[in-house]
Swiss-Prot record:
Record-listed E.C. numbers: 4.2.1.46
Record's keyword terms, sorted: Lyase, NAD
Gene: tgds
Name of this chain's protein: dTDP-D-glucose 4,6-dehydratase
InterPro entries: dTDP_Gluc_deHydtase (IPR005888), NAD(P)-bd_dom (IPR016040), NAD(P)-bd_dom_sf (IPR036291)
Amino acid sequence: MNNKDDLFIQKILITGGAGFIGSHLAIYLTKKFKNSKIIVLDKLDYCSNINNLGCVLKELNFKFYKGNILDSELLENIFEKEKIDIVIHLAAYTHVDNSFKQSIKFTENNILGTHYLLETCKNYKLKKFIYVSTDEVYGSGLIEDNDDNNNSINQSSNEKSILNPTNPYSASKAGAEHLVQSYYKSFKLPVIITRANNIYGPKQYPEKIIPKFINLLLNNKKCTIHGTGKNTRNYLYIDDIVSAFDIILRKGEIGNVYNIGTDFEISNLDVAKKIINISINLNNNNNNNNNNNNNNNNNNNNNNNNNNNDFNIMDYKKFINYIDDRPFNDHRYNINYSKLSNLGWKKSISWEEGIEKTFIWYKNNRNYWLNLNVDSYENINNDNNFKYFGNQNNNNENNNNDNNENNNNCRVCSNIDLNYGEKKPFHLTLKSEE
């Protein structure tokens, strides 16, 4: 596959492309590779949002299908109609807490759904099938030592490490990985597998720890922490995993696994403290700005100093609520990602920059996930018994003008300034529920 952007001409199917990672990736590919066609398949479950796809819904090289990967007839229709070259398989249930309560659904969606997709793919001449797995398939990054003190030692997992999943979610992803590998061996399907650290950023559904903490604080509620909060995770900002997929699309070798990781590691408790700090700092800045506008005298400087001193000795306990731990909670996920780095990838967004951008996005978009009725939206067209958004031959000039007018102001694209105020994004309007 040629590295030059203008020669990158492919038809790329992204399953789960209206979700968090998938939507950022779909927007990036649609805008960067104008000669390619980006097709998104998503059933618009609770953690997906058609608005995530923002300004690309009417791009000439984009199309959206609403449907389930468990629907083999739908998959066959899409592959036959679109002549898919590359599949990036992101569709999955991913929330660990839910997997303890609804494990059968995770098996059905993550394993059986992947199997249906593989069965369809084997009948077509794909160039790449990228299965998006998780670092959690490795299990906890601690192994027990055999000395008399029962010490544990840290272990970094590379792509050849044994899979040792410890919860129903990670087990379902590991099981699907084995299916993917079997289709590579048995049917020569050109597969690549990725395993990434935790991803965060704008548009993530607020069941995950970072948006959950942010939204709780924005609503004057406490951060809820499992157990002691000493479990650690490694965090990558969304733009960095998108750039990793760009590299893997162009340079990844068939039959290989690539870890996508970062050396930045932080405990759940310290994540909460960091977000609390940002929240208080932003509030203090707003208050100080108001004070300066109302009273321009030397006392304001003293007040500012007092606020900072109070902040430094702040008691975090009033912002945190400790709850029962998960049935099993991996201590850490430390992965070696040198293999991907050797292809030329490196992260570009620091934790400090990424977490501030993320907080500001949620602060400016507090109602983004509220009152979403995924079954009642406008401008859906029927074609061969399945539904899709995207550019149609009958799009009128007014729609194109609307798209051009709003395209530059889309608040859900990851590559724009996040300090955009309260402007509404361009999207196909959702009908409000009665």
